[in-house]
């Protein structure tokens, strides 16, 4: 996905071509989410129309999160939807991360600034 920063896209492609899969995906995540941070920071209308939901928050508090999304969108029947979908939402327990501690550190290094900016958007 090219979000207007061709050099960034080329850097991601170079990382992947060099076998740096984790770095490439971390940079890709940072590019996409950085675009979102800038868009929401620059446009009050877009910011007001947007509800950012972290997957971890949805899994930790599904009823509250679904209710907040439906309220944000001014959709009816929130309690029916909450009751229907909440029981099925949970954090995955079917895999262990294959990432090494060095790879997790690399991801944090590549994404820290954007991840911190995203914290204020919840």
Per-region residue spans from a language model:
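PAPS-dependent sulfotransferases, especially Golgi type II membrane carbohydrate sulfotransferases
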Residues: 1-122
